[in-house]
Regions:
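Conserved ATP-binding subdomain of kinase catalytic cores across diverse folds
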Residues: 1-80, 93-101, 113
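Active-site acidic catalytic loop and adjacent metal/ATP-binding pocket
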Residues: 5, 87-125, 171
């Protein structure tokens, strides 16, 4: 099996994104492992298997190579089920907001033959920002229920080795904001806001 090894560990200062500011941010291999673990906690299963490994004297993330026929939204035939394909994109938005991946672009969204996303490149993520940078109005049921069950203790237990305190707090704050959107959709009776996953 082919895999991608990433050992980047860089810290930058004075980062801003869509009007929010942070004193620092990290581009880190640890985010790759944290994203995989969080993806599995939610039951999304869109991040390829990713583990911590040491290669050539360097510690980093090792991620299974994702072979997918579609690498861009414009490639290949249109999806057989456009509604399902749209739901897949909303699931990716849901995940990207929670981990606050500001590096998601068309070149690192891989799509399977059924248009299911394969999320790669999470090293620039887990910023402490809160403001959604893409509309959040449709939600995957199973992952939402998993998110409702998750608490600070569980997140720290599973992700604490790879995330710093402010990164975990940012994740918890975004969880609260997203679940508030979910509660509002339920209160308004918007059943079309939820899709099976």
């Amino acid at each position: 099996m082919e895999a991608v090894f990433k050992s980047v560990e860089t810290r930058f200062g004075d980062y801003s994104f869509h009007g929010e500011k942070a004193p620092t941010f990290r581009d880190s291999w640890k985010h790759e492992v944290a994203a995989y673990r969080f993806d599995r906690l939610l039951g999304l299963r869109i991040v390829p298997p990713t583990v911590e490994r040491k290669l050539g004297g360097k510690r980093g993330s090792l991620q299974a190579w994702a072979e997918r026929p579609l690498t861009r939204f414009s490639q290949g035939p249109p999806p057989e089920d456009p509604g399902r394909a749209e739901a897949f994109l909303h699931a990716q938005r849901f995940f990207d907001y929670l981990i606050f991946n500001t590096d998601r672009h068309v070149r690192n969204v891989l799509l399977g033959p059924d248009w299911r996303p394969v999320a790669i490149d999470q090293s620039i993520a887990f910023h402490p920002f809160l403001r959604p940078y893409r509309p959040l109005y449709r939600f995957p049921r199973g992952p939402v229920e998993a998110l409702e069950r998750l608490d600070a203790r569980a997140l720290k237990e599973r992700l604490g080795r790879y995330l710093e305190k402010d990164e975990i707090q940012g994740l918890l704050d975004r969880r609260a904001l997203l679940l508030a959107l979910v509660r509002a959709a339920r209160a308004e009776g918007r059943e079309d806001a939820f899709f099976d996953w």
